[in-house]
UniProtKB/Swiss-Prot annotation:
The enzyme's E.C. designation: 2.6.1.9
Pfam families: Aminotran_1_2
Top enzyme category: transferase
Subunit structure: Homodimer.
Modified residues (N6-(pyridoxal phosphate)lysine): 206
Known pathway: Amino-acid biosynthesis; L-histidine biosynthesis; L-histidine from 5-phospho-alpha-D-ribose 1-diphosphate: step 7/9
Domain of life: Bacteria
Protein name listed in UniProt: Histidinol-phosphate aminotransferase
GO BP terms in the entry: L-histidine biosynthetic process
Family: Belongs to the class-II pyridoxal-phosphate-dependent aminotransferase family. Histidinol-phosphate aminotransferase subfamily.
Cofactor: pyridoxal 5'-phosphate
Signal peptide span: none
CDD domains: AAT_like (cd00609)
Length: 345
């Protein structure tokens, strides 16, 4: 791996970050706060939140078994994705490599930041070859993006191939584990210390059921986290989000119950889809969704819209011709979907 300084944009490495009032004083002893030009009325919402989310990171570290210094929190995982481009990629000069198909925001952030985005097509089984991915990289490749379980395909990428990429690549490997809670494959979090060039992304939007609060997590070396904290907006995670996330962590048993139920419902839906005559293939999934190839994705999608049921038409995505992506819902929602599909002509 190149040194962190070699990977970081020179201007970012030299950057002196903005220091907010709450950065300069974060103690608990004071009772009068006249430092941040806040309105003294409308407690507690008149106060700026902790810019480093210390209480939340402490609670999160207990669940994830990762020290707070190795945790970055952002306004959704998309903030972390955008920040790694801004921190490590020189616009108009550097490039990144990613599997295809995968989560679309990697390319959007690359385009926004004027960074070349190189795609390597997955195999027909939606797996990838580390050698093929590495062959596309060159001396200007700063990052490789992997998503496992992958979106929209739903499958876990082969762990051996992921490890090979991490070990053999000189730059940063961003591993998006947004759907890992629904997989039987263990997270790479327990191996974070082994891989100084690894950044793991997770989210509160899926298993935690908190998409509305917009909270994403990045786990990495203390040095990488320091770079991300240097360039983030001062109060990027609001106080209401921090409070709600802490509440969810205090009832983690509930999240585990949801995950168990959703995995059972995924099996129910997959079995039901296999029986539908116009379903050509149901792809194995380790996420809270699955991909199904049908005879006419556009026609079936439009039919479901007419029935008040929305799935995702992935027909235009690489390797996903005539495919629908179906999110696992409650038993009542899933039964309504299957009932509507059984009536489809």
């Amino acid at each position: 791996m190149k040194t962190l300084q070699e990977l970081t944009r020179p201007n970012i490495w030299r950057l002196k970050p903005y220091s907010s009032a709450r950065d300069e004083y974060s103690g608990a002893a004071a009772s009068v706060f006249l430092d941040a030009n806040e309105n003294p009325y409308n407690l507690p919402h008149n106060r700026y939140p902790d810019p480093m989310q210390r209480d939340l990171k402490l609670e999160l570290s207990k669940i994830k078994k990762v020290a707070p210094a190795h945790i970055f929190l952002g306004n959704g995982s998309d903030e972390a994705i955008d920040l790694v481009f801004r921190a490590f990629c020189e616009p108009g000069r550097d490039n990144v490599v990613a599997i295809d198909p995968t989560y679309g925001m990697y390319q959007v952030c690359a385009d926004v930041n004027d960074v070349e985005y190189r795609k390597v097509l997955l195999h027909d089984d939606f797996q990838f070859s580390a050698d093929e991915l590495l062959a596309v990289a060159d001396e200007r490749t700063k990052m490789i993006f992997l998503c496992s379980p992958n979106n929209p395909t739903g499958n876990d990428l082969l762990r051996s191939e992921i490890i090979k990429v991490i070990n053999d690549f000189e730059g940063l490997v961003i591993l998006d584990e947004a759907y890992n809670d629904f997989s039987d494959e263990p997270s790479f979090l327990s191996e974070l210390d082994k891989y100084p060039n690894l950044i793991i992304l997770q989210t509160f939007s899926k298993a935690f059921g908190c998409a509305a609060i917009r909270l994403g997590m990045a786990f990495a070396s203390e040095g990488i986290i320091g770079v991300l904290n240097k360039i983030k907006y001062p109060y990027n995670v609001n106080q209401l989000t921090q409070q709600q996330a802490i509440e969810m962590l205090h009832k983690y048993y509930e999240i585990e119950r949801w995950v168990k139920t959703l995995k059972e419902e995924r099996g129910y839906l997959e079995e039901a889809f296999v029986e539908l005559p116009w379903v050509l293939q149901v792809f194995p999934s380790n996420a809270n969704f699955f991909l199904a190839r049908v005879t006419d994705a556009v026609k079936i999608y439009n039919y479901l819209v007419g029935e008040g049921i929305i799935v995702r038409n992935r027909n235009s995505i690489s390797l996903c011709g005539n495919c629908l992506r179906v999110t696992v819902g409650t038993r009542a929602e899933n039964a309504k979907l299957i009932g509507a599909l059984k009536k489809y002509q």
